[in-house]
Amino acid sequence: MTSSNPAYHFHRRNGKQNDPRMTSGASKGPGDEATSSYFDHSTAKRINTDSVFTSALKKQYPGLDLIVAQEMRCNLLEYAAAGHATFNAINDKGEVPSSLEVTVYLPPSRRMDGNKGQLAELVIFGKFLYQWQGEEFVIYLVDGRDGAEAYPQLRNYYILTSNIHKAEQLVLATGSWQSDLHDEVWVFDQGGFEKDRELWKSAQKSTWDAVILDPDMKELLINDHISFFESKQTYKNLGVPWKRGLIYHGPPGNGKTISIKATMHMLADRTPSIPTVYVRSLESWMGPQYSLHVIFEKAREFAPCYLVFEDIDSLVTPIVRSYFLNEVDGLKENDGIFIIASTNHLELLDPGISKRPSRFDRKYYFPDPNLEQREAYCHFWQKKLKPNKDIKFPDELCKAIAEITDKFSFAYIQEAFVAALLAIAGRSKEKPTKPSCDDAWVLVADDQVSGKIRDADDLNKLELWVEIRKQVKILREGMEDDADA
């Protein structure tokens, strides 16, 4: 796999001087002969669009050089749309249209807010005057798929220029920009990588300052990551590979995922930014071993980077364990790669993963929250519910709920709140808004709801307290049943 842009050139052989204006390179004649050739070709047998169209362009523009670049690696219009260049469509007079577009419907990612989607134009054939860094180019975008099959796509840019060096720089700049992340995360799923902006947005909502953890452990986690990415030269001086691996383990629902997201946010804010490579599954038509190969190649390409394997016990099964260990600690260099793995079941991991320091150097245990942490979590819900005047939630209620949720994970406490609020909403004419679970680890330190509770009788008058006790009882019975099973 290579990150270079697949471009090939036709250079002038006639020794003529470069033309000062792009239009001077075209031969005289009615309309655009290259456009006519494309449409003539598209209505006949299609064998190789590239050869037909490049021949037509060389005939029409004998004084210009030609570069052909694949759209999938060098999307010039997208690069311009991001503000790095400008372009205008060129409309030629003639018997055939100057361009061919297909109007496509783009459905919304979410319909909950009433979004109906939007329309967009897919260019099948287009001709443009393209301007970049003071240079002008005539470019054609051509969908040259040969035959009736939908795959593979053959969408190419044909770049005509009087300055071949500048055109090559444009292709390089566009390809480099296109391969980078732009407020996105690399996510591997179903056998391939995609840039995921939604995961990036989710991580941006998480910060270490707002995560409820033991303060000493939180400081260790933060320093472990920062010190690694700032210690490249130290590792080199010591003669050891610049790589590191951590395992987060413990009961589900106690902050492993939100800690990973907070780290993603922290690393994205660094200068230069540290990208994240996130593994969602190893399922692939080529098999899980091939998936691991592709994943680690991507991590090496973007190193220094943060490589995430959540629920590693379900990802790295016995069938791929040997291959995984070889990628982590084999002959290939993994300099700059910080691997983070999480699991709810450390005992299910092979000792070669969980007990080999050169692969995963340290393990961090995420236990059920203690009384202080549970009370802090209740203050989060107190703040979320503050705008709802129908829910009475004084400070004393936070402590009371924390005391009856011993051995509960954050996720179980969250479920108790959600179930209680839904029950109250079902009896209320004005339903309270269900708080977002994405923020359910936030530590609230201010804006507490005022009001004092004098005794237990006053507490029992609070609808939220009465309902949440019911839900805690139900959840605890379920926990006991699971333990007996």
Residue positions per predicted region:
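Walker A/P-loop NTP-binding motif of AAA+ ATPase domains
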Residues: 208-395
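Eukaryotic basic, amphipathic alpha-helical target segments in cytosolic regions
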Residues: 61, 65, 178, 182, ...
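Alpha-helical interaction elements in eukaryotic regulators
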Residues: 166-170, 217, 320, 374, ...
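AAA+ P-loop ATPase mechanoenzymes
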Residues: 2-230, 243, 485
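Short interface patches used for recognition in eukaryotic signaling and trafficking proteins
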Residues: 158, 203-208, 362-363, 398-404
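C-terminal alpha-helical "lid" subdomain
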Residues: 356, 367, 371-485
